Amino acid sequence: GYDCSGFTQTVYSVFGINLLRNAREQMTQGEVVASLAEAQPGDLAFFDHADRDPKATNISHVGLLLDNQKIIHCSGKVHIDMIDEQGIHLADGELTHHLVQIIGLMIRYQRSQQLNR
């Protein structure tokens, strides 16, 4: 199975975008998106675990935004869950990961496609 960053790396490789291997490294690629409301489908969202102190950021998870309410991510198997400004929520509402940052990689991809026309 995939881990979270291996999953995002594989998805982006289909579009010719080479992501670094782990979530912390992937967070350095692309442009910071100010809020979930401004994010585009395909942007990457980065998280720490919900059971940790939210002020002690330790990036441990990454997922791919489907829209500003759903995220696809992988932890042994692929999941589609709800996301909000707090983070990832299971169907029962349990918060599993705190949202730390969103990186807009689709902006770069779209620009490159426009330049190649």
Where are these regions (language model features)?
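Catalytic cysteine-centered active-site loop
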Residues: G1-P41
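Aromatic- and glycine-rich peptidoglycan recognition patches
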Residues: R24-E25, T57-S60, L65-R117
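Short secondary-structure boundary micro-motifs
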Residues: Q29, F47-H49
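Well-ordered beta-sheet/strand-loop patches within structured domains
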Residues: Q40-D43, T96
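Paired acidic/hydrophobic, glycine-rich loop segments that form the ligand-binding mouth/hinge
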Residues: A45-F46, L65
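A generic structural signal for residues embedded in beta-strands
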Residues: F46-F47, H73
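Short, charged beta-turn/beta-strand-edge "cap" motif at the junction between a beta-strand
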Residues: D51-D53
